[in-house]
Amino acid sequence: REAFAERARALLKVVGLAGYEDKYPWQLSGGMQQRASICRALVHEPELLLLDEPFGALDAFTREELWCVLRDLWQQRRFTVILVTHALREAAFLADTVCVMSKRPGRIIATRSIDLPRPRDLDVTYTEPFIDIVHEMRERIGLVRRS
């Protein structure tokens, strides 16, 4: 039990929540709650982390900040992440591979490798290669939606 408490404190520090260990969720902002959720998932040191729209309810600045938190945690711990998102920029920034799914029933209909170098800084989101990837994914999704 003490080992988990120590890991939890270390994770909270990494995500910028040191000093908030004894707070209730309702006492935290949305971004802080999301950071705590990521810590809760990682405290058991999983090999696989499934995230379903983890940043969708956050404002743009907090969302991008948490992209970087997740990026940094991944760099340190090297777990596999399956990220379900409708945010194309988020997918292109965080992923190594993006899968586009069909309408119901959901099936993978396209796969795109993201060959941008790591670690990715937020500045990459303003580069032509990044923008091209996002536009390509948007086109593929548009084809799916129109079919």
Task: Give the location of each predicted region.
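Conserved H-loop
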Residues: 78-84
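Hydrophobic anchor residue at the start of the ABC signature
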Residues: 38
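Conserved signature/switch motifs of ABC ATPase nucleotide-binding domains
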Residues: 23-26, 44
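Conserved ABC ATPase "signature" region
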Residues: 2-20, 72
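Helical segment within the ABC ATPase nucleotide-binding domain
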Residues: 63-77
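Catalytic Walker B motif of ABC-type/P-loop ATPase nucleotide-binding domains
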Residues: 49-52
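ABC transporter NBD signature
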Residues: 29
